[in-house]
Amino acid sequence: MGEGGPHDPTAYAVGYSLTPAPRADMSNELLRHDTSRGHRQECRCYGMRYNRTMETWFAFGKNGLSLELPEGFRYQVLEARSAVPLADAPSAIEDALDSPIASPPLQELAAGKKSAAISVCDITRPAPNREILPPLLARLEAAGIPRERITILIATGLHRPATEAEISEICGEQVAAKHRVVSHRARQLGEHRYLGTTASGTPVFIDERFVSADLHITLGFIEPHLMLGYSGGRKLVAPGLAGEATIKVLHSPKFMRDALAVEGSIEDNPLHRELLEIAHMARHDFLVDAALARGNGRRPIAAVFAGEPMAAHRQGVKFVSQVMLETLDEPADAVITTSAGYPLDLTFYQAVKGITAASHIVKPGGRILLLAECTEGVGGAEFAELLANHPSDRVFMEEIAEAAVVVDQWQLEKLALVTAKAEVLFYVPGLPRQYYASLWGKAYDTPQAAISALTSSLPRGAHIAVIPEGPYVLAQVGQAVGR
């Protein structure tokens, strides 16, 4: 993608029409792409289970949690079971890099370049960096880019920097030992380059180490995202490598409260369009995104998409929107959800995503139970302070209505939008008890106590939706995807 060009936000979101094809007859384009990667997908949703106890596994921390749900209710389990792990993921990765979508092969694209920057997800995301980085780096070096001129940037956004141990986990021990791997630091303004403003007025500060490189690559994965519709691609540029001033605007009520800035919404999502424009300004050249399958704590690769950033991401989103979409005919009386286990449920800050994913399918006045381990507690210091100092969701929303945006308020704002609609219950054993009173819902010491509270006073035969992997399933009422 070349430098410059008009700042017309409508130019960056063309072709993301995601209205699903019938489940038994996917689009020919999607099936052709799937077949080339060695798999065929088919979606299925589990029907109701009536009036008997049910043993269910939930993604929770690294090991999961198996719970017996009480009899007397209509359970509907929503699982993205149709994403099948690739039989030969290494070959699929090689093929994606050598036969990319709407782009020359990566090695050809890198020829003549003197430096490269690769943006990768931080420890809170299960991106398959360890599998993809070695063949990607090999092609850059084969094209003539010296190893010392390749920088791997961990796209932390406003998250904390990665520890040395985490860098090895993120990139793999060999890559971490032999290559330059550094964390983005959003608060260090001097480490960013100002690229101007977007058409809507967002000031764009992007990590200088990314912008100054000759070749700009992102490596991520695609899943439903609570504000952006779907993750991956442009998100690895901003907010991943953006400065604090940029991130605050992207997470402001301007975008947070837009009805189209939600899971599964992309074609007309204003935040998606904003990030595409920012990625264009930063000269985003090449993308590698994976779609992940489920596997009781493991997230094996289901598909690989590489190439020109917009075209490759569009193909990936089409795939994910098919295999992760699960629908209900009507809203549920209650929902049991998770934050998809490790690493997404490391902190309560990240675990909020499991609650927002459930909010779209619960009745007004219904109940949501979140199961999240939260071994690292609350999250960042700013989020912890906000949570501790705002025991009322209503007062919090009133206070931020006119005030300047502060770091991490957006996650609490998303939680408040849910608690205004539904009663939220929590089993979050890693969260210090001092925060229980500030959760805008009741926390319980055991999962059994939480489930008992969820089902108490519900009438016999009440409809309870169960989402064992929380935000990794795009749960909707009817065919609401692609708005």
Model regions: which residues?
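Short, low-complexity intrinsically disordered segments enriched in A/P/G/S/L with frequent Arg
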Residues: G2-P9, V14-G15, A21, L31, ...
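Short glycine-rich or small-residue beta-strand-to-loop segments that form or flank ligand, phosphate
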Residues: S115-P126, T151-G157, T218, I336-T338
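Conserved, well-structured core segments that form the ligand-binding/active-site neighborhood
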Residues: A177-T198, T202-T327
